[in-house]
């Protein structure tokens, strides 16, 4: 009996990368300007964009309020990212 090797999930996309690529860059908005708008420090925003900081419930509410999205979108993006990272670490996909 042969065992099929599970496929690796694609490279996990961090919600910060999504923010940069789908919201800030298309709008031509700098990190400095967006940090001011959302009420975060530039350092906090930069850490989020670089994937060094995750989405918390409060951050999701901030993002939703400024971007006109839902907080659940940001929480779901973070949960999906975390699951993909865990699956890659274990070497399998569910």
What are these regions (language model features)?
Residues 41, 52, 67, 78-81:
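The DNA-recognition helices of helix-turn-helix-type DNA-binding domains
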Residues 62-64, 70, 91:
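Long, compositionally biased
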Residues 72-94:
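Short, charged recognition helix plus adjacent turn
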Residues 28-47:
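Short alpha-helical DNA-recognition segment
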Residues 2-29, 73-76:
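A short, Lys/Arg-rich alpha-helix, primarily the initiator
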Residues 52-65:
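Short, basic-rich loop-to-helix N-cap that marks the start of a DNA-contacting helix
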């Amino acid at each position: 009996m042969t065992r099929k090797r599970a496929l690796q999930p694609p490279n996990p996309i961090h919600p910060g990368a999504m923010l940069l690529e789908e919201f800030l860059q298309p709008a031509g908005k700098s990190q400095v300007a967006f940090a001011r708008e959302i009420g975060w420090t530039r350092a906090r925003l930069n850490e989020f964009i670089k994937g060094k900081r995750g989405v918390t419930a409060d951050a999701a509410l901030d993002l939703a309020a400024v971007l006109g999205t839902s907080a659940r979108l940001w929480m779901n993006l973070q949960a999906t990212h975390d699951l993909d990272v865990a699956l890659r670490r274990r070497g399998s996909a569910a």
